[in-house]
A protein has these predicted regions:
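Cysteine-centered motifs
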Residues: 20, 37-38, 42
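Structural motif
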Residues: 66-77, 87-89, 131-136
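C-terminal accessory module of base-excision DNA glycosylases/AP lyases that mediates lesion recognition
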Residues: 21, 49-68, 73, 167-172, ...
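Basic polycationic patches enriched in arginine
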Residues: 2, 15, 40-41, 53
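Alpha-helical ds-nucleic-acid-binding substructure associated with the helix-hairpin-helix region
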Residues: 103-175
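Short, aromatic/basic-rich helix-turn unit that serves as a nucleic-acid recognition element
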Residues: 79-83
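Intrinsic disorder/low-complexity segments enriched in small, polar and charged residues
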Residues: 7-11, 18, 28-29, 85
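Short, positively charged and aromatic/hydrophobic N-terminal segments
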Residues: 6, 14, 25, 46, ...
């Protein structure tokens, strides 16, 4: 059955016959966190390839196959990982969404938004914690989920698909999310453009130095362990230069 659903006829059949379990969801979408499907849900059935939404992603940020599969298939998980990417190793940050998904039974954006804040903070603090500061990050993640629900109908990918934004508009939308300053927003835009198939007009210009091809300066440039090492070396050089400038 799974093989049939990934053929053109199977995809058409799925779109025509599967009814969603809630009227606010369009046809054919399953929960985020299932490899190869989009961040929606329907009443049973199989997932549709993420490429149907114009994205082709095989990320290698967490350096863990299952955690990276979640990031590749779930735009919301990728957003959460980016939020966590500060003051800890980036691999640990991008492994965070999988930890949360394992503990609450998936990373459905509605479920995260509606979770009891105290309980969600406790879950995020369980060892191994999702972050050095799990309590504050738990709140930020729930705030992010609520914005995705309120502004984008629970579809994190609508951040870059709704209204066909150009690079400048998409950067503006990203900066409006909790935890995204100018630089982090540009890095995320660079990641979307370089690895997530989000080639909106002007994305490289809006992403600044993080949109330049052939660089190894941010998360946007990490595709394997080797490039992770190059990015880490670059950041070490930046810190050393900053320290020398203060001396």
């Amino acid at each position: 059955m799974r093989t049939f659903l990934y053929t053109p006829w199977g995809i058409l059949w799925h779109r025509l016959l599967v009814k969603c379990n809630q009227s606010k969801y369009p046809l054919g979408y399953l929960p985020a966190g299932v490899p190869g499907c989009c961040p929606r849900r329907c009443a049973g059935g199989e997932g549709l390839p993420v490429t149907l939404r114009g994205m082709t992603a095989t990320l290698c940020l967490a350096q863990e196959p299952e955690a990276d599969a979640l990031l590749s298939s779930s735009p919301f998980a990728l957003l959460v990982g980016m939020v966590l990417d500060q003051q800890i190793l980036l691999e640990a940050a991008f492994a965070g969404p999988k930890k949360i998904a394992d503990r609450i039974g998936g990373l459905d954006v509605y479920k995260v938004a509606d979770f009891d804040p105290i309980e969600f903070a406790r879950i995020c603090s369980e060892k191994p914690a999702i972050h050095r500061f799990p309590g504050s990050m738990a709140k930020r993640i729930q705030d992010l989920a609520q914005i995705v629900v309120d502004r984008y109908g629970g579809d994190a990918a609508a951040l870059w698909t709704a209204g066909d934004p150009d690079g400048a508009e998409l950067l503006k939308r990203i900066k409006a999310l909790p935890g995204f300053g100018e630089q982090k927003a540009q890095i995320f835009l660079g990641l979307l453009g370089k690895q997530y198939g989000v080639s909106v007009p002007g994305w490289r210009e809006a992403a600044g130095q993080f949109g330049v091809a052939g660089t190894y300066i941010s998360v946007a440039d990490i595709v394997d362990a080797q490039t992770l090492g190059k990015v880490r070396d670059y950041k070490k050089k930046l810190k050393a230069a900053a320290k020398a400038a203060k001396a």
